[in-house]
């Protein structure tokens, strides 16, 4: 139970989020149509952030954790260009912090739209946490790819492969040698299925 981020951060969520929004977040992250952008992704991302807790003030860390909960709170593969903006709007609607401004939450969610590592340190750590799968083992990386394909199963395979390869090519050079090996291997895999 303690591995569940909603359990680990229940007090943080209760402090800053409208009570009726927490079950909505839970439902969204557990939507059965989400094969990759689900609770496992959220948990992996938060664990990456927790490894860096000592690098942040309490306020920064809390904002990054909230941003993790909200960065894919709204996720629709049929309209992927609007997901981050809708997630930010959702956060703004349900945020109840009275005395603190949580601009870092918006900025962190916003930075996940782009295939460029941001330079401000908190945003860089957040972006890296969201994209940590690029550096995972090949088996894990392929498992993530298969999950993403399930989310886009409505797209014909040839169209999916073309768009996915274009996306992957934009990521070469962003994640070091391990990431590049995975990306190139996945491109080859997609070209041959």
Pin down the residues of each PLM region.
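Cytochrome P450 core scaffold surrounding the K-helix E-X-X-R motif
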Residues: 79-82, 141
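Acidic/histidine metal-binding catalytic segments
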Residues: 21, 57-63, 97-111
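Short alpha-helical hairpin
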Residues: 12-28, 41
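An active-site-proximal "capping" alpha-helix that borders the catalytic cofactor pocket
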Residues: 45-46, 82-97
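Divalent metal-dependent phosphate-bond-processing catalytic cores, especially two-metal-ion Mg2+/Mn2+ enzymes
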Residues: 3-12, 30-37, 47-58, 62, ...
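Short catalytic/metal-binding and nucleic-acid-binding patches
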Residues: 18-24, 36, 81-84, 99
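His-Asp-centered metal-binding catalytic motifs of divalent-metal-dependent phosphohydrolases/nucleases
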Residues: 45, 61-77, 87, 106-113
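Amphipathic alpha-helical interaction segments
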Residues: 56, 76-80, 98, 116
């Amino acid at each position: 139970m303690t591995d569940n981020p909603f359990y680990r951060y229940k007090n943080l969520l209760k402090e800053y989020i409208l009570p009726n929004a927490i079950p909505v977040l839970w439902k969204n992250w557990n939507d059965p149509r989400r094969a990759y952008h689900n609770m496992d992704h959220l948990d992996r991302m938060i664990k990456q952030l927790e490894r860096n807790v000592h690098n942040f003030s309490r306020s920064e860390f809390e904002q990054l954790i909230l941003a993790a909960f909200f960065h894919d709170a709204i996720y629709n593969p049929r309209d992927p260009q609007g997901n981050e903006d809708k997630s930010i709007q959702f956060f703004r609607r349900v945020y109840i912090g009275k005395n603190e401004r949580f601009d870092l939450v918006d900025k962190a969610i916003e930075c996940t739209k782009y295939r460029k590592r941001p330079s401000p340190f908190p945003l860089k750590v957040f972006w890296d946490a969201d994209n940590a799968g690029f550096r995972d083992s090949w088996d894990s990386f392929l498992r993530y790819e298969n999950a993403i394909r399930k989310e886009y199963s409505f797209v014909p395979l040839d169209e999916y492969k073309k768009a996915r390869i274009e996306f992957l090519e934009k990521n070469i050079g962003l994640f070091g040698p391990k990431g590049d090996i995975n990306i190139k291997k996945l491109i080859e895999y997609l070209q041959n299925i």
